[in-house]
C-alpha cells in the first residue's frame, strides 16, 4: 500500500481520486497550474504542488514537471486520472524510470490499446465478444468502387 499518491489531474476526477485515497488511508497530493491555484481539488487533497503556467502543455501535459512534483513531495506513485497523460505510454515509462509507480495500465498495454488492430487481436485472443469488422478488406478496391 502506498503512503502518498500524487494525482496528475484536476477537477472532479482529482477530487474523486482524493476521496478514495482518503478512504484507504493514503495521503493525496494535488497538482495545479497557475490557472488552478486554489481550485477545489487543491483544497481536498492533503498537499498541493505547483507544476507550471496556465497552459496545459506547460503544466498538466508536462511529464517532467509532474514527475518532479511527485519526487519533491515524496509521493510513491502517480495516478493520472483520465485525459492529459493517462494514455501516454512514454509518461508511464518515465514514471517507472523515476522509480515511482504508475497507477494504471503498463506502457505496453497503453500502446497496444492505442492501436485499433492490435487491441482487436488482444480482445479476440481473450475471448471478448467483438462485432464483425473489415479484416482483410482491400482498402484500395473500396476506394475504386466508391469513385466508380
Regions found by a protein language model. Name each.
Residues 1-148:
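N-terminal beta-alpha lobe that positions the nucleotide/phosphoryl donor
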Amino acid at each position: 500500500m502506498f503512503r502518498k499518491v500524487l494525482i496528475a489531474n484536476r477537477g472532479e476526477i482529482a477530487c474523486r481520486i482524493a476521496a478514495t485515497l482518503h478512504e484507504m488511508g493514503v495521503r493525496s497530493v494535488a497538482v495545479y497550474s497557475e490557472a488552478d491555484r486554489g481550485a477545489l481539488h487543491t483544497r481536498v487533497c492533503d498537499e498541493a504542488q505547483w507544476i507550471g503556467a496556465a497552459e496545459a502543455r506547460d503544466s498538466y501535459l508536462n511529464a517532467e514537471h509532474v514527475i518532479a512534483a511527485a519526487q519533491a513531495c515524496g509521493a510513491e506513485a502517480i495516478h493520472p486520472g483520465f485525459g492529459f497523460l493517462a494514455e501516454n505510454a512514454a509518461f508511464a515509462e518515465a514514471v517507472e524510470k523515476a522509480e515511482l509507480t504508475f497507477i494504471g495500465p503498463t506502457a505496453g498495454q497503453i500502446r497496444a490499446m492505442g492501436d485499433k488492430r492490435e487491441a482487436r487481436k488482444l480482445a479476440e485472443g481473450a475471448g471478448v465478444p467483438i462485432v464483425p469488422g473489415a479484416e482483410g478488406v482491400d482498402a484500395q478496391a473500396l476506394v475504386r468502387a466508391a469513385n466508380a
